[in-house]
Amino acid sequence: MFFSKKAKDYFLKTKKNWNKMKEKIYLIIGLVILFFALPFQSAFSQRQKSFVCVKTIKSSQSRIHSAEFSPDGKYILSVAEDRMIKTRNANNYQLRLVIEKHKRFFISTSFSNEGAVRKRICWDKDHQTLDPFSPNTLKGKRLYSADAKTASYSPDGKHIISVLRNGNIKIWDAISGKSLKTLKGHSSYVHSAEYSPCGKYIVSTSSDETLKIWDANTGSCLQTLKGHSHNVLYAKYSPDGRHIVSASRDSTIKIWDANTGKCLQTLKGHSKCVNTVEYSPCGKYIVSASNDKTIKIWDAKSGSCLQTLKGHSSYVFSAQYSPDCKQIVSASVDKTIKIWDANNGNCLQTIKGHEDSVITAKYSPDGTKIISGSRDGIIKIWEEK
């Protein structure tokens, strides 16, 4: 049976149209599958990536005040209630440097990779080198700690800055442990001191209700920032160094112009003391941790609160963005560390392992590890697996 030319053309045209329609149907089906599959894939991926404890260090008999990785990720810096500053190799966790304080002298002890004492040097208040093993130097003297409450690295990792309980701030050589400068000016207890991203300036906070900006090279005070009505507990520069954000016991956060010292905004929302506050690495957001058991995410430009993260059952002592800005890590008195999705505020993981209040938790520079310190003197290293 033969078809007419007209019927044949109609058949071919219909077949061609049907083929095109099938392609569209398959495309639509594929997009629908992809639409529903991506969230599950993302959730599965997030569930697979969790932090597990790879090292527990009994660093002190007392509370850990601060712990962090060096900017290059090679070392670990910590300060405990015993006021000793310690650095360790991040690969084998052996002690590298310990800075102590004698009644009249600062003593730094450096260690080999195997943990043996390699060098011990002593300086007096005028930075003159002394022999710590000389009986005339330390005879009948009791060793005290470096008197430090917290400590952090300079951006280049060459210096360590620590705050002392007598209201002073000290800059140390990160390799030798030598005391380089003492910054004096606060009239009360100093809570924190941090370098600017360029390393040229230092911002400090105090119970005298002020922030101070210092010249990191000369140690001179450049500005005193006033505005908080209670103890200023923490301050941090923005990634571009143009702004400073501060947290206070007055339950507020303030954003300052780092150049003029002018208060640009006051962020209100927490109902209790704000313990720490930091910018996201991209500089667009601010994260804060409070005694009201919450973490808040703020728009750094408008100052509006974008999200409130709830989940901890007690005070939240610290919160920090991951280097890629995708996650936030928090530490709490409830003995847990939590990992949050910085975009939607969901809790991705609750890390348990500490047996006492977790004071601090911070990411490594590459974001694959977290270092945490607790009230019982334990430091833990968590790695993403």
Q: Model-predicted segments: where are they?
A:
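Hydrophobic beta-strand positions that form the internal "hydrophobic ladder"
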Residues: 76, 118-120, 160, 202, ...
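Blade-level signature of beta-propeller repeat domains, shared across WD40, Kelch, NHL, RCC1
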Residues: 359-385
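Residue-level detector of Asp-centered blade-edge/turn motifs that repeat once per structural unit
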Residues: 71-72, 113-114, 155-156, 197-198, ...
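A short helix->beta-strand "capping" segment at the edge of beta-propeller domains
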Residues: 46-61, 138-140
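Short loop/turn segments that connect beta-strands within beta-propeller blades
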Residues: 90-92, 133-135, 174-176, 216-218, ...
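Short coil/turn segments within WD40 beta-propeller repeats
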Residues: 82-84, 125, 166-168, 208-211, ...
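WD40/WD-repeat beta-propeller blade N-cap
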Residues: 57-64, 100-106, 144-148, 184-189, ...
